[in-house]
């Protein structure tokens, strides 16, 4: 009578770093034909039955090397999608009702993890499993659908409120505040610049603008190297310019549009009424220019100019 073959037990292949059922009677690994295997202790029959249905799919799962595990804390009532290596995972929310999280990892996974901890073997592959909250509502959008909507920039501020998790349950703020698409950053910068456009001093009074003296540029002005602070063009002899109470000179077309929006000098930020504490620029306060017969205001002091502007 032929001798019966020995019963195959549970073995761990150090070449494949996986739990195997050896090929008998050679006691070799059916995956790599290596004999570098070691018998593992027996476990309960229930664990063997629970792992039989899922053991075939483990070989078809993708392999990811050297993945660093991460854990994100999420509000209660969320399901979780776990991506990681065995007992360590990366969790993402799936919208659902509150309840205890149901563990779906099979018994073989726990045994393989214990074997790798025991023998110091490297992790051969990562697993992607889904842990759903108990009693998940049907028809609730999935994580993939929500991310796709956010990336496409088509989700509206009122859309997330219909998901039953409160507004902006995933993002930290309004999705419209994020930069979506190729031109998203440019749009945000433009919005920020528009917010600062109307800030600052109020427009100057039209009466004060019209009361600004007009003087004629002389050779003394040209010889001193004066230029319009706005357009940076040199003044020419005989050119008519407007003089502010701070003695700064500007082209009429350069200073009038500015004063219609801001009651300040573009150079020293002094208002037409002299309300701020800005001092006159050095040199101009002491300089006096001989003007033509059409205007004598250039030879007056800044105090006289302020008085004439207030009286007008």
From Swiss-Prot:
It catalyses: S-ubiquitinyl-[E2 ubiquitin-conjugating enzyme]-L-cysteine + [acceptor protein]-L-lysine = [E2 ubiquitin-conjugating enzyme]-L-cysteine + N(6)-ubiquitinyl-[acceptor protein]-L-lysine. It is an enzyme of class 2 (transferase). Residues 43-57, 290-301 have a biased composition (Low complexity). Zn(2+) binds at residues 13, 16, 29, 32. Residues 40-62, 97-132, 276-312 are annotated as: Disordered. The keyword Metal-binding applies. It is found in: Cytoplasm; Nucleus. A zinc finger (RING-type) spans 228-269. GO terms for biological process: positive regulation of double-strand break repair via homologous recombination; protein K27-linked ubiquitination; protein K29-linked ubiquitination; protein ubiquitination; ubiquitin-dependent protein catabolic process. Keywords: Cytoplasm, Metal-binding, Nucleus, Transferase, Ubl conjugation pathway, Zinc, Zinc-finger. A zinc finger (C4-type) spans 13-32. GO terms for cellular component: cytoplasm; nucleus. InterPro entries: RNF126-like_zinc-ribbon, RNF126_RING-H2, Znf_RING, Znf_RING/FYVE/PHD. GO terms for molecular function: ubiquitin protein ligase activity; zinc ion binding. Residues 102-115 have a biased composition (Basic and acidic residues). E3 ubiquitin-protein ligase that mediates ubiquitination oF target proteins. Depending on the associated E2 ligase, mediates 'Lys-27'-, 'Lys-29'-, 'Lys-48'- and/or 'Lys-63'-linked polyubiquitination of substrates. Part of a BAG6-dependent quality control process ensuring that proteins of the secretory pathway that are mislocalized to the cytosol are degraded by the proteasome. Probably acts by providing the ubiquitin ligase activity associated with the BAG6 complex and be responsible for ubiquitination of the hydrophobic mislocalized proteins and their targeting to the proteasome. This is E3 ubiquitin-protein ligase RNF126-A. It comes from Xenopus laevis. The gene is rnf126-a.
């Amino acid at each position: 009578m032929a001798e019966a073959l020995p019963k195959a037990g549970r073995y761990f292949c150090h070449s494949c770093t996986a739990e195997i059922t050896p090929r008998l009677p050679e006691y070799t690994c059916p995956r790599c034909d290596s004999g570098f295997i070691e018998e593992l202790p027996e476990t309960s029959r229930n664990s063997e039955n629970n792992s039989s249905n899922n053991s075939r799919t483990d070989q078809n799962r993708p392999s990811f090397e050297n993945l660093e595990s991460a854990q994100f804390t999420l509000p209660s009532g969320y399901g979780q999608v776990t991506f990681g290596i065995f007992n360590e995972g990366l969790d993402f929310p799936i919208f659902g009702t509150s309840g205890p999280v149901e563990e779906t990892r099979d018994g073989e996974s726990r045994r393989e993890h214990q074997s790798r901890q025991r023998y110091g073997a490297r992790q051969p592959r990562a697993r992607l499993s889904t842990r759903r909250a108990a009693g998940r509502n049907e028809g609730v959008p999935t994580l993939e659908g929500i991310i796709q909507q956010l990336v496409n920039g088509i989700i509206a501020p009122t859309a997330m409120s219909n998901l039953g998790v409160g507004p902006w349950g995933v993002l930290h703020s309004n999705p419209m505040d994020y930069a979506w698409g190729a031109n998203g950053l440019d749009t945000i910068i433009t919005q920020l610049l528009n917010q600062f456009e109307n800030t600052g001093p109020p427009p100057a009074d039209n009466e004060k603008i019209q009361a600004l003296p007009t003087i004629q540029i002389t050779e003394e002005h040209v010889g001193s190297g004066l230029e319009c602070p706005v357009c940076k063009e040199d003044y020419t002899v005989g050119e008519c310019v407007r003089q502010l109470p701070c003695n700064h000179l500007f082209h009429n077309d350069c200073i009038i549009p500015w004063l219609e929006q801001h009651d300040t000098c573009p150079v020293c930020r002094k208002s037409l009424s002299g309300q701020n504490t800005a001092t006159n620029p050095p040199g101009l306060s002491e300089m006096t220019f001989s003007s033509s017969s059409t205007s004598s205001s250039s030879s007056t002091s800044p105090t006289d100019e302020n008085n004439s502007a207030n009286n007008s």
